C-alpha cells in the first residue's frame, strides 16, 4: 500500500518507507539527509528534485558523505533530480 505524509521534513513520519521523495531546494535537502536512515527501509531509495544544477554537487556530496550512492540524475534546464540509495546495509 502507499502512504503519503505531508510534514515538516520527516518530523511527523513514523516507520520506514521504500521511497522518500523531496521536491525542495538544495539547502533543505542537505538538512534532511541525516534523517533518511531512520525512515528508509534497507535498500530504500531517496529521490530529490527541485535542485538547481549549480547546487547539485553540494547535494550529491552530502548524500555520499552520509553513505548513499548516486544511482541516477536527470536534468531539465536549470533544475535536476537525483536518485540515491544506501551503499551498504545498516548495522
Where are the regions a protein language model picked out?
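A generic structural signal for alpha->beta connector loops
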Residues: 1, 43, 67-70
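S-adenosyl-L-methionine
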Residues: 1-17
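A short SAM/SAH-binding and catalytic strip from SAM-dependent methyltransferases
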Residues: 10, 18-31, 50
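Conserved beta-strand signature within the Rossmann-like core of class I S-adenosyl-L-methionine
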Residues: 22, 43-52, 59
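Short alpha-helical
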Residues: 27-28, 54, 58
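A short glycine-rich, Lys/Arg-flanked "PGG" loop and its adjoining helix->strand segment in the class I
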Residues: 30-45, 60
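Core SAM-dependent methyltransferase catalytic element
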Residues: 68-91
Amino acid at each position: 500500500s502507499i502512504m503519503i505524509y505531508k510534514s515538516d521534513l520527516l518530523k511527523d513520519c513514523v516507520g520506514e518507507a521504500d521511497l522518500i521523495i523531496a521536491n525542495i531546494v538544495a539547502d533543505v535537502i542537505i538538512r534532511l539527509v541525516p534523517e533518511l536512515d531512520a525512515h528508509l527501509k534497507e535498500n530504500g531509495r531517496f529521490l530529490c528534485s527541485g535542485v538547481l544544477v549549480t547546487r547539485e554537487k553540494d547535494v550529491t556530496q552530502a548524500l555520499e558523505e552520509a553513505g548513499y550512492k548516486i544511482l541516477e540524475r536527470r536534468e531539465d534546464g536549470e533544475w535536476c533530480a537525483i536518485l540515491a540509495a544506501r551503499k551498504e546495509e545498516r548495522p
